[in-house]
UniProtKB/Swiss-Prot annotation:
Keywords: 4Fe-4S, ATP-binding, DNA damage, DNA repair, DNA-binding, Helicase, Hydrolase, Iron, Iron-sulfur, Isomerase, Metal-binding, Nucleotide-binding, Nucleus. It comes from Drosophila persimilis. Pfam families: ARCH_RTEL1, DEAD_2, Helicase_C_2. One of its GO terms (cellular component) is nucleus. This is Regulator of telomere elongation helicase 1 homolog. A probable ATP-dependent DNA helicase implicated in DNA repair and the maintenance of genomic stability. Acts as an anti-recombinase to counteract toxic recombination and limit crossover during meiosis. Regulates meiotic recombination and crossover homeostasis by physically dissociating strand invasion events and thereby promotes noncrossover repair by meiotic synthesis dependent strand annealing (SDSA) as well as disassembly of D loop recombination intermediates. The keyword Phosphoprotein does not apply. Belongs to the helicase family. RAD3/XPD subfamily.
Amino acid sequence: MPESVIAGIPVHFPFEPYNVQRDYMEKVIICLRDGTNGVLESPTGTGKTLSLLCASLAWIRTRQSEHQQQMIKLKATSKEGGPGSGPGGDLSELAMTVGQANNWGVPKVIYASRTHSQLNQAMRELKRTAYANMRSVVLGSRDQLCIHPEVMKEQGNSNKVNLCKLRVHSKTCTFQLRVESKKDHPDFRGPSIMDIEDLVRVGQKLKMCPYYASKELVAQADITFMPYNYLLDPKARKANKIELGNTIIILDEAHNIEKICEESASVQIRSSDVAMAIEDVTHIMKVFTSGESQEAGGDEPKDFTLDDLTLLKEMLLELEKAIDAVVVDNPTDGTTYPASLMYELLGKANFTYGNCATIVALLDKLVQYLMVASQHMTIRKGGTFTMLSDLLTIVFANKENIMSKVHLSFKVHVQVEESNKQQGKSGAIQGKQQGWLGKGNITTTGTSSKAAKIVNFWCFNPGFGMEQLLNTQVRSVILTSGTLAPLKPLIAELAIPVAQHLENPHIVDQSQVYVKIIGTGPDRQQLISNFKNRDNPKYISSLGQTILNVARIVPDGLLVFFPSYPMLNKCVDAWQASGLWADISCKKPIFVEPRGKDQFTSTMEEFYQAIRDSKGAVFMAVCRGKVSEGLDFADRNGRAVIITGLPFPPLKDPKVILKRRYLETNRTKENQLLSGQEWYNLDATRAVNQAIGRVIRHRNDYGAILLCDSRFQDASQVQQLSKWIRGHLGARPQSSPFGPIVRELRQFFKHAEETMKQPDVREEEQPLMNVCKVEEVGTQPVIPTIKQEPGNNATFRKANKSAIKVEMANSINSWTPADYASAAGRTLGKAAPNAMDFMSRLDSNVSSIDFNCSGSADSGSGGCGSSSLVTIHKRERSSPGVTDTVATQTTKKRYKLAENIKTEPKSNSSQQVKVAPESRADFLRELRSLISQDQFRDFGKVLIEYRSGTDENFESLMTVLLDVLAAPKMRYLFIGMRRFLRNEHKAEFDVRLASLNLAQESSPNKRIP
């Protein structure tokens, strides 16, 4: 690999580095050499991660070589009888021994990022370099690395952690016991770089625990990869035995570092948590006194006594009483108190700095006891004890000698907890607040001090966490990301001394990027997604028309980012109702960002597959969502990005209000903190910068960035955009008329395709086979040349190819507003709704797509273009039924997607066995096309009721299923319903199905009720 000398250090880079990469590596090396801190911004696509790894490891390798030479020289001097011989010889030997034990004093690197996917990406980059032989390890969670089958069966990460600890403590985990004997195995020690997947694979091969084995590699590793929380959370650092002295800390993707620092120091406790903890302690005490302890926890001696339990219960009762006594003046929004309230509440219950460690140890023992007992009886598994342990650990991590700073940096916010809010049997509560506070769990009635409360202990000073990190005697801290600007307020908030800072330009030429502010749509309606205008039907329509016009021009992938899930959902609903959704789908199939992990992966795969088609695809996502954070849309995957608005945090959210108030109170000329309003604006702009960074991913990439909100014309807003974006907008950015933008955009892509190096030719789409079923609707088909047998002529194949693209778009149509519930309005203890959940789909206006052959090619309307043979007819739930739709189009054939069903001529003597579609969306579409609207309405109603979980609802469901799907021709759909039932009902379902088949065989002509 080419070698470049940068800041006096030879750096091996996979290719000749560009100037921006040289500048970046120079800043990194200077920080490491001088032991100082740096804040470095380099746009996504400039090789930031590669430069970071090569520069830091080149410096480490140079230091290793220098120290090795020093030790060799010292050893030689000692042997030659030099100054180190004789009485001083022992000193030389001691120096060499200590040097070897500490890798000759060479610092180690800790590379931290937000997610494991980002860490895996960094490790893949490392494998491409000349430093791939340097020792590295990644630290992951038990959820990712545990291979014990019993532990992995547990639901919830906390349960897995506790059961793992229990098995290790009791020496019953054979995988962990093999670590000592297998840790030097060549398969484990051989590879220099092993990511999560590598560790799991080797662990399964050697039947050795990957989680504990990875910790064996840390001591000898030159670079350790880990997520942020392992590094910034003192509790996690202690659990993972992470030593930070003389360590180089690299925080990649650090644009969210302030929030992460704040959240790692924040915690929450509910009245219901304390109440359940009291119940759990009481239960254990009853077991002790009733002689059931052998059945519950075995006959081995306990690590705690009845006196311990009695004392703990008394403390919890006092804590419950103290929380109940807190007055909430405003039941809707809650009441804010100084940080001292949290220490007062705990003090009243005798939780103090002095006994904190002892109580935390007791709580951990109780958790392990309940994990054992839960194997023999139905009880909670100690989630509330874990929550209490986290509370005490975080609150008392703030030492008494810095309490004055704690009072400035923290606030206690108390709100009313819904009386009917039950945490369930698991009792597992998340101790740390995630994201902005949701207000869905606040009741609006009553101010009684006896009402259940939620007590939030919130940190608003990210510098508090960073200061604790610096106090561990680290050598250097480097914060880096593609979107850190503006740097001054970031440095001021983190309150760390920064010697090196950098704002790199982009690696691409000006001609490779087209950036415009679109302040008005094609109809000259102002585009502004503020609170007053976001419900304006004219605005929503104009935004849809803008996206439609851009989709006609942009080749391949088009990304559209919305400020929030509710706004995305609102637009989707409006466009579906008006027909704009169908118009956009004609140009490109549409994908919408789901919120479930599994659905997200499959949706992304479908999107990438759709990009191979000549039409490309549209992906609609949300700022701060998964798509905007770290995903790669290089080349054809993302040729343009549309930003539809500024994603401001909820203005009236208590946490937002308190953050703004904290900044206004503590802002001085000396500390250069942002004002509350500046922070509020910057939080939105940083999310925009992240979304923009999805499209330009490397030196030869090109794309367009369209800012579809007139507020981007404000100079204050533009100044917070990344430096390379500001260069394209100029000193006084102005919105351009829509017409000229369309012409310029078309010319930009035409010029780019002619002059820029294009990626490899896309794979040709496989022809769509056996998915179009022709139903005879009228006696005079519009295109008589289309035959029943698919693929027999070019015209049919062309229509076929178009149909599958539109079908992919249709899979999104049945998503509902509930699937995109606002993060600000979500109940704190409630899981986010699953956008792909089968039951949730039944609450929506399920759309049906008919593929009708165009009958008027010369009319210029009603199709996807003059050459298209497929048109879309959208039918809402309130629209006429299938029979009505058919009746109005008696001269056409209707092509309806029926997955995996081959079209064959009907036979009176035999009938082909059908199988229900595997996709839930396809299942619903096919069912709806075969039954009446009233039947489908009844079907949806009982399915929604079935979710409540009672046997009566199962009986109601079966009654409707037998009424709707009992006919022989519908039997395949009846059978297909089985996979959507809960496990406890599947056996009964099989009995009903067998009875149904038997009745049909005995009376083939009799209708089954």
